[in-house]
């Protein structure tokens, strides 16, 4: 297994993982309401491409959650390549699609179809949420509000009450975004 994950890092460290993992900021505490700072029960920490590759390489199951940030980065083809590489290593790969991720409903479906991600790997929120508790790694790429747990219980949040993809229930969650600031695209 170490050879498999090392191979993934060697093959993609410069091309793929540098695109995906290169823009992490400093570690910070995350509060239970999804905002930065305050009372915490989970700690956010930066990881480098090697640590990310090892987490993904040792996983049995990975759910990729694309968002508007993936669209802006035009990374859908790179994301598909990552999924294919993980599948070659025996990892079960799925894509979780929030109905309003991106700039319009269906935006992520269109981008992933353009990148030739098999439609059978795309799962809508209602179907995939029950699976997150059994997922080894949830990989969130450029999604903010559609995974923010503040929508569940922070009545002061502008997204309070919005259904979210429950990535926080996965064993590990990797969030790829440009900064640690909160953001609603």
Predicted features and spans:
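Membrane-embedded alpha-helical bundles that constitute the cytochrome b-like, heme-associated redox core
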Residues: 31-34
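Single conserved hydrophobic/aromatic residue that forms the stacking wall/gate
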Residues: 1-12
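Terminal amphipathic helices with adjacent charged low-complexity linkers/tails
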Residues: 10-28
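Structured cytosolic domains appended to multi-pass membrane proteins
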Residues: 38-185
């Amino acid at each position: 297994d170490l050879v498999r994950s090392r191979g993934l890092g060697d093959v993609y460290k410069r091309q793929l993982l540098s695109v995906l993992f290169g823009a992490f900021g400093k570690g910070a505490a995350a509060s239970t309401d999804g905002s930065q700072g305050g009372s915490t029960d989970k700690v956010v920490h930066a990881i480098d491409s090697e640590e990310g590759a090892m987490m993904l390489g040792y996983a049995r199951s990975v759910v990729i959650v694309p968002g508007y940030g993936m669209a802006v980065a035009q990374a859908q083809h790179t994301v598909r390549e990552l999924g294919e590489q993980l599948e070659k290593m025996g990892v079960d790969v799925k894509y979780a699609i929030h109905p309003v991720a991106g700039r319009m409903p269906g935006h992520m479906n269109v981008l992933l179809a353009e990148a030739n991600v098999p439609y059978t790997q795309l799962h809508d929120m209602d179907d995939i949420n029950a699976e997150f508790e059994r997922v080894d790694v949830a990989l969130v790429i450029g999604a903010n509000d559609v995974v923010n747990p503040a929508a569940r219980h922070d009545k002061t949040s502008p997204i309070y009450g919005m259904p979210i993809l429950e990535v926080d229930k996965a064993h590990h969650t990797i969030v790829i975004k440009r900064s640690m600031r909160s953001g609603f695209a």
